[in-house]
Amino acid sequence: TVWTFHLRDDVDWVDVNGEVKTHLTSKDFLVGFEWVMNSYKNEANNTTMPNDNVVGAADYYAHTKELGDAAADLTYEDMLSFGVGVEAPDDYTLVFTCPNSCPYFDTVAAYNSFYPAAEDLINELGIEGFRACDNTTMWYCGPYIVEEYIQGNTKSYIPNPSYYGANDVSRFERFTVTMLSDMNIGYQLYQNRELDEVDLMESTLTTITNDPNNGYNSQLCEKRPKKFSYCFLFNYARNNADGTPDENWNKAIANKAFRQCFYKNLELRPFYARYNKI
């Protein structure tokens, strides 16, 4: 299956101060994809979907792993020469080739494994610097810029002055996302009017819904499941602590009936009932 994406021609990269740094083109998607599939640069983060859904991606990853530190010098051009199924015929066209039929690939390509990355920024920060970049050093191309980031506390956003859709949408002048370690604390912050929206724990939701006079009943909104799927990733060549093959496990997991036992008896309706109690 071949998927062709046509990109906008009016997207710019800006820094944390809103200053335009460079123009975004299809090359940035090639640079970003090579980074993700390079074992040395990316350290294997978020490689599963590209490995499974793009021709040659898994082989390229294995190649970079074999190269070790030498993989640091590879570029997107090396990835293309290796035969990975992604190409950019022009500045605003991106083509992916899947090993099998993948009618949902457009949703796969929206995942962060396929995000663009500016080559100039990587060259400026270096591999270690890009891997560790924060809100002050990264570049942006979306509707907002992260003005302030306090680890484990808050993320504050302001509008990107060069956002391509600025004239077509309404944006907050500034908004802050509070990171919560305990959702009960989140409920308290909501009650104190310090938050505009919060997810509720099941116990809190039960307390509210069991009391028809509770004032928060009128403020409840249904929480719809997000787009996701479950999967099992099995190790078919497990070793014991001494390095010898675990013959019992390897023989069992090779059996289809054994693998099916992991999910055949799953009953997910109680889970969904709790996830969407309203």
Language-model region placement:
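Long alpha-helical, hydrophobic tracts
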Residues: T1-V2, Y115, G126, R274
